[in-house]
Curated annotation (Swiss-Prot):
SUPFAM superfamilies: L21p-like (SSF141091). It comes from Haemophilus influenzae (strain PittEE). The keyword Repeat does not apply. GO terms for biological process: translation. One of its GO terms (molecular function) is rRNA binding. It holds the Pfam family Ribosomal_L21p. Belongs to the bacterial ribosomal protein bL21 family. This is Large ribosomal subunit protein bL21. NCBIfam families: L21. Keywords: Ribonucleoprotein, Ribosomal protein, RNA-binding, rRNA-binding. GO terms for cellular component: cytoplasm; ribonucleoprotein complex; ribosome. Part of the 50S ribosomal subunit. Contacts protein L20. Disulfide bonds: none annotated. The gene is rplU.
Length: 103
C-alpha cells in the first residue's frame, strides 16, 4: 500500500515505515503530524484518485529529526573585471517516518 500526498508545495510517494525529508515543519522531534492533502491511495488492485484530494484519506507520520541540507554554492563571475561574488545556502528540512496510511 502506498499513497501520494502534498506537503511544502511538493508531492511525495510514500509507504508505511518509510523515512522522508520534507520542507521544514515547525514541530518538535517525536511529534505526530497528519497530512490531509492525499492525492492518491493504492492498495493492491484498489486505486483511489482524488479530485483534487481523496476524501477521508490521511497520512500519519512521526517527526524523526530537523536539520539542514547540503550546501548549494551560488557564484556570479564577471569575466575580465576581477570581480566575483559567492554565496551559499542550506535549506532547512524535517525528516518524518510514515506510521500509517488511512483511506
Amino acid at each position: 500500500m502506498y499513497a501520494v500526498f502534498q506537503s511544502g508545495g511538493k508531492q511525495h510517494r510514500v509507504s508505511e515505515g518509510q523515512v522522508v525529508r520534507l520542507e521544514k515543519l515547525e514541530l518538535a522531534t517525536g511529534a505526530t503530524v497528519e497530512f490531509d492533502s492525499v492525492l492518491m491511495v493504492v492498495n493492491g488492485e484498489d486505486v483511489k484518485i482524488g479530485a483534487p484530494v481523496v476524501a477521508g484519506a490521511k497520512v500519519v507520520a512521526e517527526v524523526v529529526a530537523q536539520g539542514r541540507g547540503e550546501k548549494v554554492k551560488i557564484v556570479k563571475f564577471r569575466r575580465r573585471k576581477h570581480s566575483r561574488k559567492q554565496q551559499g545556502h542550506r535549506q532547512w528540512f524535517t525528516e518524518v517516518k510514515i506510521t500509517g496510511i488511512q483511506a
